[in-house]
Structures are given as structure tokens and as C-alpha cells.
Amino acid sequence: MGSQLVPPPSAFNYIESQRDEFQLSHDLTEIVLQFPSTASQITARLSRSCMKIDHCVIEYRQQVPINASGTVIVEIHDKRMTDNESLQASWTFPIRCNIDLHYFSSSFFSLKDPIPWKLYYRVSDSNVHQMTHFAKFKGKLKLSSAKHSVDIPFRAPTVKILAKQFSEKDIDFWHVGYGKWERRLVKSASSSRFGLRGPIEINPGESWATKSAIGPTNRNADLDIEEELLPYRELNRLGTNILDPGESASIVGIQRSQSNITMSMSQLNELVRSTVHECIKTSCIPSTPKSLS
């Protein structure tokens, strides 16, 4: 999802964590954010409220030599998602660039669950020794509560660069996109009872034989799967000569109605002439008179 640089909002009523030194690591390392106190969370839980992050600020202040090189990567994860889908936003910037990172959430969370957001950093391609205290991080967090969730307009991540020798061309940031969805049709009671099916859909590499089923669908309750009778599935292994049913009945009927006799134009004229001559000859013979007796 594309993002752009915009001025970050002014901070007020933020929960601030301590500005702590962190060691350089090539592996993801957590930056602990300060969330509302347990008492505040219990109060919101008793009022049956849900919460969201309005705004999160991550302040990065480097403390490395001027010839230090490398890239710092900061990531925000939502632990309600599976591990390979938990990443929500990320930033990359030079290790010597003092910077403020701004993140805006687009979802609510329940206080009955652990607070899902985790903040991590790692450093790549650096000439600074690992385990060196290379920078200080500080997190500022603003949350809000609501009786129920509502649609939240999307706001892209932003940055505020505090080092004059760097610009937005040296920074990159990313935000997760909306999840994919597709319409799923509901099976009616009648179609489920009698095993009725829709039309067969033939996909590339398939044939009618691989998709044709006979009889009602049997459902395996133990495995929760539908068992189909597909007697023609293996027919594609046979040769085309065996499977070819021949010409259709309509083509055969047309062929039977067609004559194999061919005549030239002169032969046709001669046939017509002789036929006409015979007709004239027959019609011109006088009838035998009847005798009067």
C-alpha cells in the first residue's frame, strides 16, 4: 500500500515509555511500549469498551560514528494474526538518521485479550559490531476507547526526518493492505438434502470426465468432507480413438439422405429430352374404337 510524507499531528495526552538504549542486533528485537495501566484497562473492560491505537510515535536517536553504515528496520506486528500475516507496517532508514516514525491503527481490539501490538527492530548490512548500544528508542502511544467498533478511515504511516544530510529518498515505509475476500454462496436445504449440483465448471487442464459425478454426494461426518462418485475421472488416460463416440446422429441422417449418383449437364438434358419424347409418344397413340354390337 503506497504511503506519502505528510506532517505528523501534534502530540497530546500520550503515554510515553522511557528512552532506552538498545543493542545492535541482526534479529528482530522487541521495543517495549508503555500501555495504559492495569487499573485503566480494568475500568474500560468493566464498561464493556473496546480500544484502538489512535497514534503511535517511535523516536529513534542514533549514537554511532559518522562513518557507520547500515539500515535500521522497524516493524509493527498484530499478534492476533498468524505469524506470516502479523506484520502491519514497517520502516527502513539509515542507521545514522535521527527520525520519528508515526503509525495510525485501523482496527479495534478487545481488552479481554492481551494487547496485540508488538514493536520490533533489527539492523542489516552494518559495519557496527553486534551488541553495541547503537541507538535510543522511545515510544509514545495514544489510545481511545469506544462502546463498539466503527469503520476507521485509513491513514498512511508517516515519518519526520531530523537529520539534514538525509531526505525522503533515503527512507522507505510500508503498510499492510486490506484482506482479500470473495463471495461464498450458501447451499439451500433442498439442494443439500438431495445433493443437487450447479453446472460443471471446466478449468484449464481439465475435461468433462475429470469433473463429472453421478448420484448424490455422500458426506463423511468424521472427516467433514464430501465424497463424490467420479467414474469418468480416469478416462483421460485412454486414447482418443477409444473415447471417440463417432459422428452425431444428425450428421449420419444427412449422409443417408444424400444420393451418390452424379450426372453431367449433357446427361441431364438427354434424360429430360428422352422423358419428354416418351410422354408425347404415349399420349399421341389413338385409342381403339369400341364396336357397336
Swiss-Prot record:
Entry membrane topology: Peripheral membrane protein
Keyword Isomerase applies: no
Any one GO MF annotation of this record: DNA binding
Result when mutating F35A: No effect on subcellular location. Reduced levels of infectivity and very attenuated disease symptoms. No effect on NSP relocalization
Top-level taxon: Viruses
Task performed by this protein: Transports viral genome to neighboring plant cells directly through plasmosdesmata, without any budding. The movement protein allows efficient cell to cell propagation, by bypassing the host cell wall barrier. Begomovirus genome is shuttled out of nucleus by Nuclear shuttle protein (NSP) and the movement protein transports the DNA-NSP complex to cell plasmodesmata and facilitates further movement across the cell wall.
Similarity-based family: Belongs to the begomovirus movement protein BC1 family.
GO terms of biological process kind: transport of virus in host, cell to cell
Assembly, per entry: Binds to dimeric supercoiled plasmid DNA.
Resulting phenotype, N260A: Mislocalizes to the cytoplasm. Almost complete loss of infectivity
Post-translational modifications reported in the UniProt record: Phosphorylated.
InterPro entries xref list: Gemini_BL
Subcellular location: Host cell membrane; Host microsome membrane; Host endoplasmic reticulum membrane
Keywords (A to Z) from UniProt: DNA-binding, Host cell membrane, Host endoplasmic reticulum, Host membrane, Host microsome, Membrane, Phosphoprotein, Transport, Viral movement protein
Gene Ontology CC terms, in alphabetical order: host cell endoplasmic reticulum membrane; host cell plasma membrane; membrane
Name of the protein this chain belongs to: Movement protein BC1
